[in-house]
């Protein structure tokens, strides 16, 4: 009986020893900061450039003094004249688009480009602006533009130009202003039902039509030596202002 108990005790101790196994090696703790993998690659890591703090009260546009020569040179290059004029015009217009009161016809603008391209020293921007009674900014924009319309675009452009002239002269006819022959042939100002046109009545010329140019061109006389007036035969002819009044009567 004692042998049976001894065997049971020995068997129990053996089973208990199997169930309460202690690990031989200590458990590995997880890494708090895992190390990046090292491998070969052609790509270079971007280096972090530390920004240099600028002292207080220093303007980046101020001159930088050369440490070797002791001379100062501008940090920012000088702006061209056209950029200064563009900024001044933008401030003058108050952010609105460029929309001059006086607009030149497409043929006139093409003639301005032709004059400047053939003789740029003679037909400068101030000379063209004075002759065509527009601002130098308008001449500069015309000369800067290199856009050329196609045949279809040219026809549509001329059609819009004719409609614009017809609308303007129709409004002037209502004010008693006589339209030019070109617009009269197109039917502008034509009376209906046998009535007399408004520009032929006693209410004619009640509105003083002035040019949209500035007052600087009030006493303007075209210079025939710069741009001569040519007649139908292709020969130069004197302007009316150069002919004495006694010869014109």
Curated annotation (Swiss-Prot):
A matching Pfam family: Neugrin
UniProt main location, coarse: mitochondrion
Transit peptide: 1-39
GO cellular component, as recorded: mitochondrion; nucleus
Biased composition (Basic and acidic residues): 44-53
Disordered, as annotated region: 44-75, 227-249
Recorded coiled-coil stretches: none
UniProt KW keywords: Mitochondrion, Transit peptide
Polar residues bias spans: 238-249
Annotated compartments: Mitochondrion
Family, as annotated: Belongs to the RRG9 family.
Function, as annotated: Required for respiratory activity and maintenance and expression of the mitochondrial genome.
Protein name per its UniProtKB record: Required for respiratory growth protein 9, mitochondrial
Native species: Pyrenophora teres f. teres (strain 0-1) (Barley net blotch fungus)
